[in-house]
């Protein structure tokens, strides 16, 4: 495998050249060659296609390549469509986000304490059914709505409703049920009639195992021996309104533009949906920033597939990445965003471990904050990333100041030191970003 060791650390040069398509392609090609990204990428700005390309195979058995029109399962990117369905009904006065869950499912435990608003922004406390071990043996079965709800209905709440935030597919499953009860249609019918058809999204739909779709990608993953195999074929009755949609990168762009241009909802409803509540999460979508650039985004993951969709309103920039081998679409998407904003991005490469004087590791031990908390410990003459409740991950030296995660995740820790070996600065590099580590 060819090794690529490059850094995009010259944003002024990038700006002067304005050769974004080449830079985006350079990164995406490396992601394909080094990390085996398999899928389709789209970068749009101000109505113009900056970069659009497909990689790898849609069907490995028949050697059919992915194209820019390939349809993929998008997992939890579905949630923003579900939220929009709820807000459409709210805008028509048919429901309120302040309604209690008990109004629609009267026998739901503590349903009088849980509101539609809480379901929309993951503050209901309802446990996430995909975290339950008993779900996955049943995931291949065409479970009824009642059977699905029974999986989590009587589980203790993770916390008192409205007090905390915890991602819950269960909450968005229940929102689909509410759409059906209020509209009198199936969730699929309501979504099709009120969003998909109206926006002309010809390659977007709710999936099921019986569907025969032109240009559909199969989902893949590697087994323990590193051999490609088909991903688990789960029934779409499980993901339902939390993650059962299929789409293309182009349709996701069209959807994003329509949502932000108030072509889906009235302006007040759009604003409510895109308001950050707890943990910078709106209704079915996240709101944060990349440096100084406001970002509205969500990722998705379902066996064999991963997706990422982002939009920067002030910059009119949209990035859509969908994979059919579980590749980290989010990290690729963030890297492409960073390139568009002239931020430093490390192009993927294959690192090589070298021997160093392990005494220098003592200078790196400590607790830091980057994209999240990072604790570095020294153990048996080696540096590790430590996290309570998880196995320690070895950080292997690429040099005395640069270390790569031994889990092949493409993450790095880098340090700047003075002449005595004392650390001056440190950075976490991963998920498409290079972020300085601050001492806790």
How does the language model describe each region?
Residues 17-53, 180-185, 189-193, 197, ...:
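Catalytic loop of the DD-peptidase/beta-lactamase superfamily, centered on the K-T-G motif
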Residues 78-82, 115-116, 171-174, 241, ...:
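Catalytic-loop motifs flanking and including active-site residues across diverse enzymes
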Residues 1-19:
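Bacterial Sec-dependent N-terminal signal peptides
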Residues 18, 26, 33, 37, ...:
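Active-site-proximal loop and beta-strand segments within enzyme catalytic domains
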Residues 8, 108, 123, 277, ...:
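Residues that line or immediately flank small-molecule/substrate-binding pockets and catalytic motifs
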Residues 122, 207, 371:
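Conserved residues at the C-terminal ends of beta-strands
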Residues 50, 108-115, 125-131, 188, ...:
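Secretory-pathway/luminal and periplasmic proteins that interact with or process carbohydrate-rich
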Residues 113, 147, 208-211, 289, ...:
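Coil residues (strongly favoring Ser/Thr
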